[in-house]
A protein has these predicted regions:
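Catalytic Walker B motif of ABC-type/P-loop ATPase nucleotide-binding domains
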Residues: 153-157
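ABC ATPase nucleotide-binding domains
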Residues: 216-256
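Conserved ABC transporter NBD signature motif
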Residues: 50-66
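The feature captures the beta-strand-to-loop junction immediately N-terminal to the Walker
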Residues: 27-29
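Conserved ABC ATPase signature
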Residues: 128-132, 136
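Conserved ABC ATPase "signature" region
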Residues: 88, 103-124
Length: 256
């Protein structure tokens, strides 16, 4: 699969299959195409060449199968909306109705509270979103994305506004969620995620994926005497981390 913007190549030769219960980290330099690849999977933009399939069909045909938390979620801190209100937005269909989810508002509220509890946020359900910390907000936004009962969760830089301890707690939470849903997380911080994800793909205009080697983040710097971003520039293949439960295979036609 290829994608360009205003004639400038952004991604080329992308070949990736995401399987059930995968937990993949996309790493790479700024401008390498990580967020663009997420947007392509979501169907927000279309490839120039090749095709993307979600559950065997074009992106957009199974929107509820995809949960998405963007890098920047803009919410006015003074807007009088609670954490539960934000979560319930995940039930809304087109036109702002609950009908698309085939659940009544009461059913959605009950499920929303259960989801917040799963995210460790039940006690904050009635708090204004502006009163929550960065890590707490991220948990609320993920709870919102889970309200469609997705098969795949896409997270763009989810730990960017969270401190070190909060990052560890957050990643443990994702590890637990991974029992029920496949997860793709975009990150610059390979070292913080390396103990939790099952595989890592380097995205730098291409996607470099290898399922045989087991390379720790520390080894990358030792072997190449450079940072993760420099490693991506020399197109080091994907690392599969210790503890990976299974191997992956790329789709021959550039499917996702």
């Amino acid at each position: 699969m290829d994608f360009s913007y205003n004639g400038d190549p952004v991604l080329s030769g992308i070949n990736l299959t995401i399987r059930e219960h995968d937990f993949i980290a996309f790493i790479g330099p700024n401008g390498g195409g990580k967020s663009t690849l997420i947007r392509l999977i979501l169907g927000l933009i279309k490839p120039d060449k090749g095709k993307i399939r979600v559950l065997g069909e074009r992106p957009g045909r199974h929107t509820q199968a995809l949960g998405y938390v963007p890098q920047n979620v803009h919410i006015n801190n003074h807007f009088p909306i609670t954490a539960l209100d934000v979560v319930l937005m995940g039930c809304l269909g087109t036109g702002g109705h609950f009908g698309q989810s085939r659940r009544t508002r009461k059913e959605c509220e009950k499920e929303g509270l259960v989801t917040l509890e799963r995210m460790g946020m039940a006690e904050h359900a009635c708090k204004k979103i502006g009163e929550l910390s960065g890590g707490q907000r991220q948990r609320v936004f993920i709870a919102r994305s889970l309200m469609t009962r997705p098969r795949l969760l896409l997270l763009d830089e989810p730990t960017a506004s969270i401190d070190s301890k909060g990052q560890r707690d957050f990643l443990k939470l994702l590890e637990a969620l991974n029992k029920d849903v496949a997860i793709v997380v975009v990150t610059h911080d390979l070292f913080s995620v390396s103990s939790y994800v099952k595989s890592v793909a380097c995205v730098n205009h291409g996607l470099h994926y290898h399922s045989e080697e087991e390379i720790k983040g520390q080894m990358l710097e030792t072997m190449y005497a450079c940072s993760v971003e420099d490693v991506c520039r020399v197109q080091v293949l994907t690392q599969v981390l210790p503890g990976a439960g299974h191997k992956h295979a790329g789709g021959a036609d550039g499917t996702s």
